[in-house]
Amino acid sequence: MTRGKPDRKATKKNSAPSFSRRKLWCFRLMAMVGMPLVFFSLVELAFRTLGFGYPTAFLLHSSNHGEKTFVQNNQFGWRFFGPHLARSPNPISISQEKPSDTIRIFVFGESAAYGDPQPRFGLPRMLEAMLALRHPEKRFEVINAAMTGINSHVILPLSRDCAEAHGDVWVIYMGNNEVIGPFGAGTVFGSQTTPLP
């Protein structure tokens, strides 16, 4: 090797592309997050294509004598409590296209709003009867979207699903189950608090 000439092997080695530490960590992070995300997305797509699982929306699209309707999903509570503990919502069948002469009212809440143990005599039914008596010239549609044993973390997705039905008024009567309900601090599902001394 002479003094004035550069070494060709060393030049080739130095000119090869090198990843910086930042690019390497970005690649690793994308692989750690991206690969599982792609995998689970494909599994979810396969399950939906094959018909596994159950619908999770509160209102399901249906039809009655050619008219498009919304009906209740009796499996809605399964994702929060499982099939053995979940309660079913009150039967619902309403037109997807709200009639122009109708005022559609949704009642959200827990067992008190639902009318447990007899929903026929609960808040939604009383509200419907009082409105019909007070305003006989108007048509009211009061939908009992309350369920027994739920609290705000269940009412939020339930109300988002009901937004598709274009309600005019939402009545919210809740709060009892936030502490003593299924996920409150005072039950077996919630964190157990120690009694005060």
Annotated model-derived regions:
Residues 1-24:
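N-terminal Lys/Arg-rich, disordered targeting/topogenic segments
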Residues 24, 89, 154-157:
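Short, conserved clusters of charged catalytic residues that mark active-site
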Residues 28-46:
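Hydrophobic membrane-insertion alpha-helices, especially the h-region
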Residues 50-135:
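Membrane/wall-proximal cationic-aromatic binding patches
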Residues 53-60, 153-197:
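Interaction-surface signature
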Residues 122, 126-166:
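A conserved hydrophobic secondary-structure block that centers on an alpha-helix together
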